[in-house]
Amino acid sequence: MIQCFDKGVFLNKGQLSATAALSAEQARENTMAWQILQAHNISGDPERQQVRFDAMVSHDITYVGIIQQAKASGMKEFPLPYALTNCHNSLCAVGGTINEDDHMFGLSAAKKYGGIYVPANQSVIHSYAREELAGCGKMILGSDSHTRYGALGTMAVGEGGPELAKQLLRNTWDVPMPKVVLVYLTGKPKKGVGPHDVAIALVKATFETGFVNNCVLEFCGPGIKDLPIDYRNGIDVMTTETTCLSSIWETDEVTEGFFKTHGRVEDYKPLHPGEVAWYDKYITIELDKVEPMIALPFHPSNAYTIKEFLANAEEILKGVEEDARRRFPKADPHLTDKIHDGGVWADQGVIAGCAGGLFDNIAEAADILRGKFTGSGAFSFDVYPTSVPVSLELMKLGATADLLESGAIIKPSFCGPCFGAGDVPANNGLSLRHTTRNFPNREGSKPGEGQFAGVCLMDARSIAATAANGGRITPATDLDYTPVHHEYHFDDTVYKNRVYYGFGKADPSVELQMGPNITDWPKMYQLSENLLVELAAVIHDPVTTTDELIPSGETSSYRSNPLRLAEFTLSRRVPEYVGRSKAVAQQEKARREGAVSDRLRQVLSRVGDADQLAGSTQFGSAVFANKPGDGSAREQAASCQKVLGGFANICYQFATKRYRSNCIHWGILPFTLDEGTPFDYESGDCVFVPHIRQAVEQGREDIPAKVICQDGSVHDLLLHVKGLTADEKEILLRGCLMNYYAARNKE
C-alpha cells in the first residue's frame, strides 16, 4: 500500500529510475519545490533560502499577537495580502465580550494596515485561502500548522506568529534548502475510501521514524489524474501530521478546473518536475490498495485499517486505556465498554474543518445517509462545511436536506471540533472525527478534573456509514451506495458582501479597537552572561505536543492577553508548572532589584562564588521534554513559557522546525542533548550554563553545563545549540524578536 525508501531516486520522464543522464546535483534543481523556492529566494544562494511570500493568512487565535508584535516593531502597513479569518471564534461561553473584541480589533487592523477581514463563520482559514489566495507557483505563509495548499500548486508553510511579523516588516523566512521527498501515486481509490484514509495511512508510515521531518513532499505520478481536487486537498492538508515542512503537487486540468470555477483561471499554470528530477527519498502509494482507516488516540499515526481494528478492538482499546491512565492519573478511562452487541459503538461523529468539511466529503456522506437514520440513542452526528459558499452549494443540490433528514446537525463554518471549542464529548465518550488531530485533550476534555474522552480519526465516508448504523463503527466499503458526481459551483456573492478587502488601501487614521482583554506584551530582558534555569517540568513522553504545552479550546479565549493565557501553560499535562515558574520568576525579579533569595544563593554556591555570580546570572525556568513541539504552529506554546520567566527548552530533538523557531523568537534557548545522554533529573533541579551569552555570540554549538540537584549533588551536562543564523543569535541575545526589532529601529 505505502512504502518508504530511504534513498535517492530520479523521476525520469515520469518514471522512477535509479539512473539518469543528469547528475543528482543537476536534477535536484528540476523539482517543483526547487523551482518555486528559488523564485521566492532573495539571498542569491540556493542553499540558504531567504523567502518572501506572496500572501499570508491568520485566524483569530493568532492575529492579534502578530499585529501587536509587528506594530511594536515599527510596521506601518501590510506589505502583502494578509487575510484575517475568524474561524477559531471561541463563541465565548466564558469571558464576556473578549471574543468579539478580538474580531473588532482584526477589522480595525485590516482597515488601518490594509488587510483582508473574513467575519466569523464565513469560512475556515484554509478554505478561504484555497478559494481566494492560492495560485500555481505561489507561496503562502500562515500562522496555523495546517497551512497547506500544495494540491493547488502553492507551496504553503505554517509557522509561529513571529515569522509572520517578520514578513509584515519586510523581512524574510530563512531556512536551509530542505530535502525534497517524492510521493509517487499510482492506482485509483476504491469506492468508500476517502482522502483521510490515504492521509492517515501516509502519517502512519512516516511519523514515528521522522522519515519526512522538515522536508518538502512533492506529489507526482499517474494516480493523481483520477483524484478530484477536494480529494487532493484532503490528503495535502494532513501532510502537516507527517512533520514535513511543506508540500507541492503536479497540476493538471482538474486543478485548472478549480481555478476556473473560482473565477481565477489566471492563477493556474501547469506545474511538473523537469524531464529528469532528483529526490532525496521517495514514497510510493498504491491508491487502489488503501483501505478505510481509523487513527486511535492520541495521534493520527496510531492507525489501523478499520477491519483490523474491529477484529482486535478489545486489545487495541485496552492499550489506549493504559496509555490514558499513564498520561492522566486523575481520570478513569473506559473505552472497552464500547464493545457490545457484536460491534464497537461510538458516541459521536463529526465532519469538520479544513480536512473534513470539504464539499465532496459532505456530498458523499449525504449519498451514504440518504434514506437512512442515525437513530435516537446516544450517537450524535454533526457536520461543519468549510465555508458559506460550500454550505450554499450543498443546500442547492439537496445534500443539506438529506443530512438533516437523517438526523445530522449542520453547523456553521468553524474550526471548533478540531481544537476543543465545539462538540466536546461526554466523559469516556468515543468520538469519530474527520478533522486533523486527535492529540490528548484536543477535543476539550479536562483530565485535571477527572475527565477523559477519546477521539478517533476516520474519513467522512466511514463516519457516515457508522452514522447510518446508529454509531456502530463501519467502514464505508461495507455499505452498498452510489456516490453521485456533482459539478461544484462557487458563488462568491457572500464574500463580496461580507468580506472587507483592504489590501493596498491602508488608512493610518483608523484607530485600533482595543477591548479590555487585549494587552501589550510584558517587558522581556536580554540574555545575561550566565544562565541558571530551574526545571519546572520534566516530561518523558516520546513526543510532547504544542496542545499540551498550551491547551486550546476555551483557553483560547485569552489569546490576546499574554499574562492570562500563560496561566494555562502545561495545565493539562504538568499542572504544577505555572506555580513553579512564577516562583522562579519572582526570585529573578528580586535579583534584578538587588535582593538575592536564599534559595538562589544556595544553588549558585554549588558552582562558584554566589555573590559574584548573582550579579551576572539570569534565573529562569525550563522545560525538559524528549521531543517537544509536534502539532499546532501557535506561538503561544513558546511565548507563554517566556511570559512566565522561561529561558530554555532542553530536549533530544525538536519535533518541528516551527516550534524551535517559536522558542528562538521568544528568547528561549533551544538546547539539545546527544541521543543516549541520560536525563534522570527532576522538577526543582537546576541547570547552570556559564558564559552562555558569549557562547551564543561566538556561535559555539557545544556548551558545557552543570546540573545542581536538590540533594546538593552537581553533575556535568553537555548541551548543544546548533545551526543558529546570525539573526537568531541576535534575537536570543536581545531576549526576543520584538527587542531585536526595537534595537534595529534605534540604529
What are these regions (language model features)?
Residues 1-747:
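Fe-S-dependent hydro-lyases/dehydratases of central metabolism
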